């Protein structure tokens, strides 16, 4: 069983039900919808398709809504584009005007209040770089450090800066309401810089009936990296969004930052997704490059919860093969990881009862050479905490509602199983043992470790740790 989960972005190449169905059969766990592109009717069509296919297959494919996030763009040019050379003078302005070879307007009207002399401005994914030389109320006069072509409405970024634009735009609010109405499982919050960004989003979700949605913080700038612990304290996971992050920080630092974020989140018990250009060449070609294979494998070695396909599955020629190849790389890599040695070497912080029981369950599974850990959890918290310790055996997550069942699709090493609410511990134990036997085809005499809450139906009531033998 593959432990690392796979997220696939759904787009023109994968929105056909037959193609999406094959992606699911090849091991897709989460369907991502990128709300930086497309209209609500277009996304509605995709969501309806995803729900129909997962219902047909009877598998927990979760839906992730990826927000556009705070956006900073230049305006338009008289001729559509210009070319700048190193050393040229150029001005960004909040005044409304058509751009030319010397000046262009910007979308964020509070920009001049947030900038300082010496700041760098990156445009078009960092391809053209400017340094601020002087400022007034409306204009930032800059020197071109790295020249290139600028065209209409290209994105802007500001390395090392936290701008004061509200985190939730009107566009994002409308998208969140759309997601709530459609029962999405995850929100991927773009450009998270601090804890308050997540709190603002969660407050909006709470006010509009979206309490059950898990929020994944996309780390795309240095502030997000610096504030990772406080961000993790209020979100349900993070995404190492290497595209924009690689623009905001020196690209040579990206591998070390990725390893740091994965390790930090794993030890904190948060799901972590590694994303962007993982199998980029498969947009056009049927096979990945050797470097891409190593990239996916290294994320798996680091302990990422999931790896993500973007353009490969949304617009590529081989979306089904991309899922298959990613799964094969992950599964083969996992065969070479000594999870027992890693578990014994790691220094975990045990913060509460759920942590303690989850850690004990993993220890018992290793010491008894158990075939599986079976976890009953109303909210999925205990399952995620067992997953945090990356045990060497499969984790069966028994969920009593479909929302929790689908959200377990993103947890490392977890095989989600949908069950009913049981009237007593005896009935629960009976069902759990047989579920493990049937789902995993266990032999009589196999040992399983059981943990989770009792049958009271109260979330967070983890108090059970048992050893059972398969009859």
Predicted features along the sequence, with ranges:
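Non-catalytic helical/linker scaffolds that mediate oligomerization, partner binding
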Residues: 1-471
């Amino acid at each position: 069983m593959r432990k690392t989960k796979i997220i696939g972005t759904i787009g023109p190449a994968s929105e056909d039900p037959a193609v999406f169905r094959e992606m699911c059969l090849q091991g897709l766990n989460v369907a991502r919808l990128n709300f930086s592109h497309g209209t609500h009717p277009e996304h509605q069509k995709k969501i309806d398709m995803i729900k129909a296919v997962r219902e047909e297959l009877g598998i927990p494919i979760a839906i992730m809504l990826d927000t556009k996030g705070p956006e900073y763009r230049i305006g338009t040019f008289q001729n559509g584009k210009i070319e700048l050379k190193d050393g040229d003078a150029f001005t960004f302005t909040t005044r409304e005007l058509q751009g030319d070879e010397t000046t262009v307007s910007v979308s964020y009207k509070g920009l001049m209040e947030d900038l300082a002399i010496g700041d760098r401005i990156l445009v078009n994914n960092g391809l053209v770089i400017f340094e601020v030389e002087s400022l007034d109320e409306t204009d930032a006069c800059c020197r071109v450090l790295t020249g290139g072509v600028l065209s209409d409405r290209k994105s802007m970024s500001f390395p090392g800066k936290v701008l004061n634009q509200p985190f939730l735009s009107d566009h994002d609010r409308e998208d969140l309401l759309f997601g709530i109405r459609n029962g999405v499982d995850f929100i991927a919050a773009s450009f998270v810089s601090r804890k308050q960004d997540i709190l603002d989003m969660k407050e909006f979700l709470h006010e509009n009936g979206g309490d059950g949605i898990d929020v994944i913080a996309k780390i795309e700038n240095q502030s997000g990296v610096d504030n990772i612990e406080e961000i993790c304290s209020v979100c349900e996971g993070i995404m190492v969004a290497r595209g924009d992050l690689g623009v905001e920080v020196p690209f040579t630092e990206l591998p070390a930052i990725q390893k740091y974020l994965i390790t930090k989140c794993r030890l904190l018990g948060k799901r972590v997704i590694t994303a962007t250009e993982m199998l980029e060449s498969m947009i056009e070609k049927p096979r990945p490059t050797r470097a891409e294979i190593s990239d996916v494998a290294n994320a798996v070695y680091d302990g990422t919860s999931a790896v993500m396909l973007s353009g490969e599955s949304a617009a590529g020629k081989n979306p089904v093969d991309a899922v298959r190849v990613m799964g094969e790389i992950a599964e083969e890599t996992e065969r070479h990881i000594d999870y027992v040695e890693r578990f014994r070497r790691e220094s975990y912080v045990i913060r509460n009862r759920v942590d303690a029981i989850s850690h004990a369950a993993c220890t018992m599974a290793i010491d008894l050479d158990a075939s599986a850990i079976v976890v009953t959890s109303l909210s999925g918290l205990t399952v995620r905490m067992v997953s945090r310790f990356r045990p060497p055996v499969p984790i069966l997550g028994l969920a009593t509602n479909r929302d929790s069942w689908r959200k377990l699709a993103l947890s490392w090493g977890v095989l989600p199983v949908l069950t009913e609410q049981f009237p007593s511990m005896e009935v629960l134990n009976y069902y759990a043992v047989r579920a493990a036997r049937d789902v995993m085809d266990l032999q009589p005499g196999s040992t399983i470790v059981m943990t989770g809450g009792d049958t009271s139906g109260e979330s967070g009531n983890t108090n059970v740790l048992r050893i059972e033998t398969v009859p």
